[in-house]
């Protein structure tokens, strides 16, 4: 597998991470370097680790996991998105927005955006491709795309001066990404 093919694969895998990062950036009123690093690092790390897991597992379990990976991503994204939408309608001012760069939400988003990378790992094993270069490129591209997505999403928030609507829109975007994943797997 040549470098340009690996790079195109990495960019394709990073699109979901980019879209989720835009939604997260849109939700976060204060985007610090620490938050950018945390989300970018986790998305890049998960995007890099999932192909390794798939590659190590090999072809034996491909048919079992491929049949359900898109459903897992869809459920995780819809669950997080629905919670964000519900929280956007909470009128109590003392209820803080949940930070997508911390805790369980960070891990769930990282998992949801990296499910396709698991299947790529299975494919790389089936093709008998070395895993090292693809994993490094996939991880770095996901990290960079997440970083850019956070900055773009936050810039859109700053330019519009919106409040709770940002969380509503971010939740809607996550649900749409989940629906897109199902559509890509020909569920409907």
From Swiss-Prot:
<feature type="transmembrane region" description="Helical">
    <location>
        <begin position="106"/>
        <end position="126"/>
    </location>
</feature>
<dbReference type="Pfam" id="PF02659">
    <property type="entry name" value="Mntp"/>
</dbReference>
<keyword id="KW-0406">Ion transport</keyword>
<protein>
    <recommendedName>
        <fullName>Putative manganese efflux pump MntP</fullName>
    </recommendedName>
</protein>
<feature type="transmembrane region" description="Helical">
    <location>
        <begin position="131"/>
        <end position="151"/>
    </location>
</feature>
<dbReference type="GO" id="GO:0005384">
    <property type="term" value="F:manganese ion transmembrane transporter activity"/>
</dbReference>
<keyword id="KW-0812">Transmembrane</keyword>
<keyword id="KW-0464">Manganese</keyword>
<feature type="transmembrane region" description="Helical">
    <location>
        <begin position="36"/>
        <end position="56"/>
    </location>
</feature>
<feature type="transmembrane region" description="Helical">
    <location>
        <begin position="168"/>
        <end position="188"/>
    </location>
</feature>
<keyword id="KW-1003">Cell membrane</keyword>
<comment type="similarity">
    <text>Belongs to the MntP (TC 9.B.29) family.</text>
</comment>
<feature type="transmembrane region" description="Helical">
    <location>
        <begin position="6"/>
        <end position="26"/>
    </location>
</feature>
<dbReference type="InterPro" id="IPR022929">
    <property type="entry name" value="Put_MntP"/>
</dbReference>
<keyword id="KW-0813">Transport</keyword>
<feature type="transmembrane region" description="Helical">
    <location>
        <begin position="60"/>
        <end position="80"/>
    </location>
</feature>
<keyword id="KW-0997">Cell inner membrane</keyword>
<comment type="function">
    <text>Probably functions as a manganese efflux pump.</text>
</comment>
<dbReference type="GO" id="GO:0005886">
    <property type="term" value="C:plasma membrane"/>
</dbReference>
<keyword id="KW-0472">Membrane</keyword>
<keyword id="KW-1133">Transmembrane helix</keyword>
<dbReference type="InterPro" id="IPR003810">
    <property type="entry name" value="Mntp/YtaF"/>
</dbReference>
């Amino acid at each position: 597998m040549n470098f340009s093919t690996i790079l195109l694969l990495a960019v394709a895998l990073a699109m979901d991470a980019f879209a989720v990062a835009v939604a997260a950036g849109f939700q976060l009123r204060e985007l610090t370097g620490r938050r950018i690093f945390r989300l970018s690092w986790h998305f890049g790390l998960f995007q890099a680790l999932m192909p390794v897991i798939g590659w190590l597992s090999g072809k034996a379990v491909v048919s079992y996991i491929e049949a359900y990976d898109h459903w897992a991503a869809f459920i995780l994204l819809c669950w997080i998105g629905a919670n964000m939408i519900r929280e956007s309608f909470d009128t109590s001012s003392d209820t803080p927005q949940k930070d997508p760069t911390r805790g369980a939400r960070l891990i769930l988003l990282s998992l949801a955006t990296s499910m396709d990378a698991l299947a790529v790992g299975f494919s790389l094993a089936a093709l008998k491709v070395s895993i090292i270069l693809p994993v490094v490129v996939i991880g770095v591209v996901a990290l960079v795309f997440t970083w850019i997505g956070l900055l773009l999403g936050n810039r859109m928030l700053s330019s519009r001066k919106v409040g709770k609507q940002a969380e509503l829109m971010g939740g809607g975007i996550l649900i749409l990404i989940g629906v897109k994943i199902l559509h890509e797997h020909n569920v409907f």
